[in-house]
């Protein structure tokens, strides 16, 4: 029994969530191999080979994989899957796009978004927006699994010395064609991996008022998030959305401002290490998960908070 993990990267560096997925995959079985598909990915393969618990790195390098099309990735994974009992990857946009295609072609039932490995065939996963948990046992000979990366600690980046093997890929698909990629460039930490996140909700009342959050985020070197209500109201773009239909975050510090705390939002942030809530409604559900709560008008509290941060005259790194 061996595990094949699909690495996520940008052709230059390994994406952080791959390290978390390695931790989870190694709990399934210690015979862990990692598949790296991309263009000019020698450095990516080398980096992964140095991760403890990784026994082998399989590299498929071709320009047709430069833009990470799931339609091009899938035939490669199917081709390499023959000798593996488990095919795994992260349960983010990358994995959610890729793994259902793999599972369908392998005619196996996918086990999605696991948060705990109970045994090689049994896993724990959240249901009902995280308000309940299901223990799932898979009887399939070959198991396709996506892992919620925030539920596992990242694997160390050094200490290993895995073998790197280069193999051929498959022909490019003609069903889809890459057109272009639009990326939002920001000096802020990435929302999904930031140590500190400050999010605003419908209580911000307008996009202009999000400048209050921006000023504090600058001081804390924090990522900016938002509830779905704030996004739907047009206060901020949807790439900032935290929750069941947005990003799942587990920062060291999560500050919720003007967010009532609908279960869909809580599903995306309630595993944060420390949660601070600021809301003038003392009955808001957000206070039920908060470690620290401030019942106050955010338009009075945030300027005072910023004033205190300015007195410190420091920016967190």
Predicted regions and their residues:
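N-terminal glycine-rich FAD/FM-binding segment characteristic of electron-transfer flavoproteins
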Residues: 1-317
């Amino acid at each position: 029994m061996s595990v094949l993990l699909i690495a996520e990267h940008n052709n230059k560096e390994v994406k952080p969530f791959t390290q978390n997925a390695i931790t989870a995959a190694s709990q399934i079985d210690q015979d862990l191999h990692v598949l790296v598909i991309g263009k000019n990915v020698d450095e990516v393969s080398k980096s992964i080979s140095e991760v403890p618990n990784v026994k082998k790195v399989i590299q498929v390098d071709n320009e047709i994989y430069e833009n990470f099309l799931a339609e091009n990735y899938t035939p490669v994974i199917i081709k390499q899957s023959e000798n593996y009992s488990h095919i795994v990857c992260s349960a983010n946009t990358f994995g959610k796009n890729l793994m259902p295609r793999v599972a369908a072609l392998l005619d196996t039932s996918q086990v999605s978004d696991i948060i705990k490995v109970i045994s090689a065939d049994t896993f724990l996963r959240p249901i009902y927006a995280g308000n309940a948990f299901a223990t799932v046992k898979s009887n399939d000979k070959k198991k396709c699994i996506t892992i919620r990366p925030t539920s596992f600690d990242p694997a160390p980046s050094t200490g290993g010395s895995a073998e790197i093997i280069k193999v051929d890929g498959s022909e490019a698909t003609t069903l889809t064609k890459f057109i272009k990629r639009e990326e939002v460039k920001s000096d802020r930490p990435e929302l999904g991996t930031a140590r500190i996140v400050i999010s605003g909700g419908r209580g911000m009342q307008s996009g202009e008022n999000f400048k209050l959050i921006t000023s504090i985020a600058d001081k804390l070197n924090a990522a900016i998030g938002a509830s779905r209500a704030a996004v739907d109201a047009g206060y901020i773009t949807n790439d900032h959305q935290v929750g069941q239909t947005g990003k799942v975050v587990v920062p060291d510090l999560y500050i919720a401002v003007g967010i009532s705390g609908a279960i869909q939002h809580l599903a995306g942030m309630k595993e944060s290490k420390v949660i601070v809530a600021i809301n003038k409604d003392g009955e808001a559900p957000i206070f039920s998960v908060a470690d620290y709560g401030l019942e106050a008008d955010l338009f009075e509290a945030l300027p005072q908070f910023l004033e205190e941060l300015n007195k410190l005259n420091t920016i967190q790194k």
